């Protein structure tokens, strides 16, 4: 798999991801369910040019959603919590110092 196919999107707008980013130099990504920790680590290092110390993965259970009168289940997805090397940082937005 190509690195672009492994990493789906960063999860940056939650309280937990903001807290982990500020306290522990960790970043959260949604990744493909088939990807393992080694592939995720290599993809992050290739795409963002940062050092990765650790990768923790979780399978998130899909939610039940209302569809008309019935319910449909969303797919399960995989979340990766990536610990970056001390001093490395990933900028998702162009942050201006004010």
UniProtKB/Swiss-Prot annotation:
Keyword Repeat: no
InterPro entries: Nucleotide-bd_a/b_plait_sf, Ribosomal_uL23-like, Ribosomal_uL23/eL15/eS24_sf, Ribosomal_uL23_CS
UniProt keyword annotation of Electron transport present: no
One GO MF term: rRNA binding
Gene Ontology BP annotations: translation
Any Gene Ontology CC annotation: ribosome
UniProt xrefs under Pfam families: Ribosomal_L23
PROSITE patterns: RIBOSOMAL_L23
Keywords: Ribonucleoprotein, Ribosomal protein, RNA-binding, rRNA-binding
Family annotation (HAMAP family): Ribosomal_uL23_B
PANTHER family from the UniProt entry: 60S RIBOSOMAL PROTEIN L23A
Family label: Belongs to the universal ribosomal protein uL23 family.
Chain's role: One of the early assembly proteins it binds 23S rRNA. One of the proteins that surrounds the polypeptide exit tunnel on the outside of the ribosome. Forms the main docking site for trigger factor binding to the ribosome.
Oligomeric and partner information: Part of the 50S ribosomal subunit. Contacts protein L29, and trigger factor when it is bound to the ribosome.
This protein's name: Large ribosomal subunit protein uL23
Organism encoding this protein: Sorangium cellulosum (strain So ce56)
Highest classification ranks of the organism: Bacteria, Pseudomonadati, Myxococcota, Polyangia, Polyangiales
